[in-house]
Regions:
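Non-heme Fe(II)/2-oxoglutarate
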Residues: 1-86
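Catalytic core of non-heme Fe(II) oxygenases with the double-stranded beta-helix
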Residues: 67-71, 75-158
């Protein structure tokens, strides 16, 4: 299937109240922090690509709060990109918190599985920041870097 889109976006899918509800739910239901050794592979010199606080939360625990965007993403995944995808309900979601104080960043990387039995076909990013921020631009690489401005708005998703 040929697609005319590199990505899809939903601007301000969640309002400030919903963002706070989801954030609070993740704080309550998160069960651990991501092991840095299991995060994105470091650069050849050992410098980490990912310097971010990442909490893990089971999808089942917050499904009711994010079901709307998940359903939208499944529909777009099928109708616009030609993939039939279904998130296993026992999968973990990553909640990344970026701060200027810690000089957080997640450098260029490719989303792929470490195992040969499966690979990622769909990544959904939701901006759950309670307010607008500077920096932290998100780029896709497709014949050159392309900034995705829609993700800057709180409550938006790509």
């Amino acid at each position: 299937m040929t697609t005319k889109f590199l990505y899809w976006h939903w601007e301000e899918f969640y309002d400030k109240k919903q963002i706070k509800t989801i954030h609070d739910l993740i704080q309550d239901k998160s069960y651990t922090k991501e092991d840095p050794d299991l995060a994105a592979s470091p650069y050849e010199d050992g410098t980490p690509r990912k310097v971010v606080d990442t909490q893990l939360v089971n999808y089942r625990e917050i499904e009711y709060a994010i079901r709307g965007i998940i359903d939208e993403a499944y529909t777009i995944c099928l109708t616009q990109f030609g993939y039939t995808a279904k998130l296993p309900t026992n999968d973990d979601l990553h909640y990344n918190t970026y701060t200027s104080r810690k000089k957080s960043r997640y450098d260029y990387h490719i989303d792929e599985a470490r195992e040969n039995t499966h690979d990622y076909k769909l990544t959904l990013l939701i901006n759950l920041s309670p307010k607008e921020y500077e920096g932290g631009d998100f780029y896709l690489f497709s014949s050159g870097n392309m900034m995705i401005p829609e993700l800057k708005k709180p409550g938006s998703a790509i």
